[in-house]
């Protein structure tokens, strides 16, 4: 699976063929050995050199990956409610593009630091967002993660942001 002269399909087939059922499951969900089934890390596959990695990264206002070095941190963007209020499709796509570029950069750097500045693990290329639930009740505790209460606005916002993330 590390042979770059093979096609992606061949490499994926080779990799999957080397994994046990337990290892396959461990790569698509949280690692319960970390003390909780509600975490954002895989177990990794040490015998194949596949490290534990952070599979969901907060992307509401930026790549929540702390800093990988002094003064080298992810960009911060306006939150979804502010972005939705702008009604500016190109800014939504640019936010997605920035997030996608930074996720790729953090992934390529090969590590992630926790809030204490210690190297924690690899950062993945998947994110918590965009959240497109409809903000209908101001008491909903996660309304700030939503672009607004209009279903069309939410759908267009999500489409532009995801397409921006995938362009990189």
Model-found features: residue ranges?
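N-terminal beta-rich core of secreted/periplasmic extracellular enzymes
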Residues: 1-168
